[in-house]
UniProtKB/Swiss-Prot annotation:
Its cofactor is Mg(2+). Residues 92-343 form the GS catalytic domain. Disulfide bonds: none annotated. GO terms for biological process: glutamine biosynthetic process. Homooctamer and homotetramer. GO terms for molecular function: ATP binding; glutamine synthetase activity; metal ion binding. The gene is glnII. Mg(2+) binds at E113, E115, E174, E181. It comes from the Bacteria. This is Glutamine synthetase.
């Protein structure tokens, strides 16, 4: 027998990488990740190589059922390697794997809230051509054809993620018309990142069938309209047991150069979204607070009440690389917790 394997990878486009994929026909029974062959592609067409030395290598790192094709067909997320099998410069997963392994004993886990916006014919869904809809207010978690746009795509995407076995944990309509969110986690750093990249691919691929485009642009409409983020919820074993560890983690993100070190890697266009308006903190200031959606980092009220839990970094853009944001949070917070003896 044969089956189709859709090899998916992250390209070298700057400042925001794109997803690419192509299909390999494999003979035999599906036998898991380790049985999948490495493959290759033309890196000169993906901003990952020069034409005179264009070969790049695809190494499978995660696989799941293909919910669109069905049957025995699979999706295969890959790392990009050089031909000497070292990580390619665009491969951010390899660096996360090292940091995640170093701090594995602290048991870090993540939940990421992926916001995105639907466009059709150059306009956000729900925006009249050449004009604007009613101001924000009734769209968030709304219901009804006058306030909700694209639900058929959202439901199809949710079903596809569930069929694929991804760790998707919810969906909701967002503040701007045509803007939605899905959540992945809580799971380990590598798992949340792998699953989010595949969920993004499924979002684009599902929307294709509806002749709709999905964008992770952090500020898709200028003016008094919310941007799109990827709020990143994070905890360690100590944070899930102690409020002191929560404070240590929140404080560590504001120390020295850490605020800028993080923000400059939280997605292109961060200054367009983090203005201090529309439930954001200014990009060049750091703050944290309980139940404060205008802070850089929010401590949920339930966490303060329970004396344990997690923090929400509200700064990452919708277009952030999850391998990068999880690596930075694990490195900064786990280092501080280790130094404080809160492990």
């Amino acid at each position: 027998m044969t089956f189709k394997a859709e090899y998916i990878w992250i390209d070298g486009t700057e400042p925001t990488a794109k997803l690419r994929s192509k299909t390999k026909i494999i003979t035999g029974q599906p036998a898991g990740l380790d049985a999948l062959p490495i493959w290759g592609f033309d890196g000169s067409s993906t901003n990952q190589a020069e034409g005179h030395s264009s070969d790049c290598v695809l190494k499978p790192v995660f696989t799941c059922p293909d919910p669109i094709r069905g049957g025995d067909d699979i999706l295969v997320l890959c790392e990009v390697l050089n031909i000497d099998l070292t990580p390619h410069a665009s491969n951010t997963r390899a660096a996360l794997a090292e940091v995640a392994e170093r701090f594995a004993a602290q048991e870090p886990i993540f939940g990421i809230e992926q916001e995105y916006t639907f466009f059709q014919d150059g306009y956000p869904l729900g925006f009249p051509k050449g004009g604007f809809p009613a101001p924000q207010g009734g769209y968030y978690c709304g219901v009804g054809a006058d306030e909700i746009f694209g639900r058929d795509v959202v439901e199809a995407h949710l079903d596809n993620c569930l069929k694929a076995g991804l760790a998707i944990s919810g969906i909701n309509a967002e503040v701007m018309p045509g803007q939605w969110e899905f959540q992945v986690g809580p799971v380990s750093p590598l798992e949340v990142s792998d699953h989010l990249w595949v969920a993004r691919w499924l979002l684009y691929r599902t929307a294709e069938d509806f002749d709709v485009a999905a964008t992770l642009d952090p500020k898709p409409v200028k003016g008094d309209w919310n941007g799109a983020g990827a709020h990143t919820n994070f905890s360690t074993k100590a944070m899930r047991e102690s409020y002191d560890a929560i404070i240590t983690a929140a404080e560590s993100l504001g120390e020295g150069s850490k605020p800028l070190d993080h923000v400059k890697n939280y997605g292109a266009g961060i200054d367009d979204r983090l203005t201090g308006l529309h439930e954001t903190a200014p990009w060049n200031e750091y703050s944290y607070g309980v139940s404060d959606r205008g802070a850089s980092v929010r401590i949920p009220w339930q966490v303060e009440k329970d004396g344990k839990g997690y923090i929400e970094d509200r700064r990452p853009n919708a277009n952030v690389d999850p391998y990068v944001v999880t690596r930075l949070l694990v490195d900064t917070c786990c280092s501080a917790l280790e130094k404080a003896g809160q492990v």
